[in-house]
Amino acid sequence: KEGYPKNSEGCKITCLFNDPYCKGLCINLSTQADY
């Protein structure tokens, strides 16, 4: 869990690489307003 970005931008970047840890967060971010 350490070393993984928890903010939206960082999560988007890891999501592009299909990061398994950030995948769930990316789904939540996609349902929220993207800024």
Curated annotation (Swiss-Prot):
GO terms for molecular function: sodium channel inhibitor activity; toxin activity. Has the structural arrangement of an alpha-helix connected to antiparallel beta-sheets by disulfide bonds (CS-alpha/beta). Expressed by the venom gland. InterPro entries: LCN-type_CS_alpha_beta_dom, Scorpion_toxin-like_sf, Scorpion_toxinL/defensin. Gene3D superfamilies: Knottin, scorpion toxin-like. It is found in: Secreted. It holds the Pfam family Toxin_3. Causes paralysis and death in insects (A.domestica). Keywords: Disulfide bond, Neurotoxin, Secreted, Toxin. One of its GO terms (cellular component) is extracellular region. Belongs to the long (4 C-C) scorpion toxin superfamily. Sodium channel inhibitor family. The keyword Disulfide bond applies. The keyword Disulfide bond applies. Residues 1-35 form the LCN-type CS-alpha/beta domain. PROSITE patterns: LCN_CSAB. This is Putative neurotoxin.
